Curated annotation (Swiss-Prot):
GO terms for molecular function: 2-hydroxyglutarate dehydrogenase activity; L-malate dehydrogenase (quinone) activity. This is Probable malate:quinone oxidoreductase. InterPro entries: FAD/NAD-bd_sf, MQO. The gene is mqo. Belongs to the MQO family.
Amino acid sequence: MKKVTAMLFSMAVGLNAVSMAAKAKASEEQETDVLLIGGGIMSATLGTYLRELEPEWSMTMLERLEGVAQESSNGWNNAGTGHSALMELNYTPQNADGSISIEKAVAINEAFQISRQFWAHQVERGVLRTPRSFINTVPHMSFVWGEDNVNFLRARYAALQQSSLFRGMRYSEDHAQIKEWAPLVMEGRDPQQKVAATRTEIGTDVNYGEITRQLIASLQKKSNFSLQLSSEVRALKRNDDNTWTVTVADLKNGTAQNIRAKFVFIGAGGAALKLLQESGIPEAKDYAGFPVGGQFLVSENPDVVNHHLAKVYGKASVGAPPMSVPHIDTRVLDGKRVVLFGPFATFSTKFLKNGSLWDLMSSTTTSNVMPMMHVGLDNFDLVKYLVSQVMLSEEDRFEALKEYYPQAKKEDWRLWQAGQRVQIIKRDADKGGVLRLGTEVVSDQQGTIAALLGASPGASTAAPIMLDLLEKVFGDRVSSPQWQATLKAIVPSYGRKLNGDVAATERELQYTSEVLGLKYDKPQAADSTPKPQLKPQPVQKEVADIAL
């Protein structure tokens, strides 16, 4: 019966798309150089790059909702972290010999420096206005307890001192010092508990929804840019000249139109996979998606909010995905401070918060069903974790909060459903299928269509991700003197690494901090810490990571 239902649903969707395409033929076809599908931060960032690189190119942006930045880019639908690996312990895994690997942390931090430079440049151009409306200084802290975790944090701190990107980080195992940094976390805690923390003053809280709205508002000032809201893509067809005809339904009046585009970017968040499949390019057959949602506890009580100014990340429990690490965060949303704690994983078959319960089923094909099954069979610990999260009670969530805020009161907190994160599942020759953390740009060989899949680190690295897309799709243009000069004006460090160059790191941090109104003091000498005891780690099955 389920197979029959699925078949009928697929037929209905297919017939509807054919009908839409037929109706659209009757109307005049719109032409555009660049079609941006999705009104989130990725499309907004790519459009902003292209506006500077090729100001004469026409652009059309499509958004199925009634406003932009309503899904994962919305400030309430994500944690608002400027991910730079200052506190996120999952970016510094422990090796078998007990040493700490910092390569991933360095890469994440380098990427965020590109985002800071991109935003600073847009502020100088007047594209982004009032930096405090979208980015604020909020110190980033790691906080752990227990002897093994304290030893891990010692080793992590020592390892990160090798990088110029992490200079200025502080370390302490002293209760009084940590209480000064994060009083809410320490008050009411057992004074005999062994704890440790790191703190970096230059951490940030970012409202990605506000950035998105401001970027798009600036794009709209040009006559060769068009934003179409309540517009849903129903079909994509490659033409003989390698342009694309995209059939778009107006969700308000039921009409349809065809848009002919030279280049199509699918930046539709969770919906990107289905649209990539609709394009029919062979590269899409390697991918599947699995949706995971997230919930946060939220407090707007001034007694709580005014007592906490930090993002405090802990360490994931044994057997849990590294990215599932709980954190208690200062956020600045809609002009006021709030505190969030989470995330707690949730499950829905929707690929978007405003999506359809059919999303997961309709994206499952004969080419990706086996990789999905392999991932499920190979990652039973992950499945068990997700089930345990879905089964959490109100009391369970509150007890988790008290590990980070011992004196928390239930009446100060409410539960908030954040956005959906579609995890990448990719075909693998050896394993059949693997779960991939991170984002991935998928494009055709001709460079006429590209999609962004994945969820983490996501919005905080929109600027470097879109740089990667430009290099992948417009390689010849990127190598031209004109584009090189423009890209280096937008991102001064473009084409080189900051890590290892103390002077360059300080110069870029000083520049972006001044323009964005962020706190920055030149780093002082590193804190002296007990020498970490590097212990060989027991061999354990690696738990696949997911983004919440």
